[in-house]
Amino acid sequence: MKTLVVDAYDSFVYILVEYLKQLDMNPIVYRINEINIALIEELSPDMILLGPGPGHPKDAGYTEIIHRFKGQIPILGVCLGHQAIGLAFDCKISKACNLRHGKKSLITNDQQCIFQHFDSPCLVTRYHSLIIDKEGFNNDELIITSN
């Protein structure tokens, strides 16, 4: 399995890369300004990971990738990448009411796919200022798998 990791200039992406290596997911890393649709097609990854980074997801450069490969290649977004997926599917991105920079909290999950080996609830460390606002969430293309 080959995993394309798109780095939006955040060092945490390399922790994710190490996890992917441990899972034999063969990560290849490109910075957001080095990647384009043609190169992704040429690389032919089995999965795309859109990494964390600074700023607002509307400015991340991920939207074109999401729209082009949705439904064809599994796409996982972490932090900024997660927010960009929500934005690409017309979800509202809001400032978090309670900032969780480096804070631990319990989340519930559906124990499916990427959560299949996790308890629910499980303890996670969060580091974000923006959220996908679930108030008014009405999207039949996305499924909420954790909360």
Residue ranges of predicted features:
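Short gly/ser/thr-rich secondary-structure transition/capping motifs
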Residues: 28-34, 57, 105-108, 127, ...
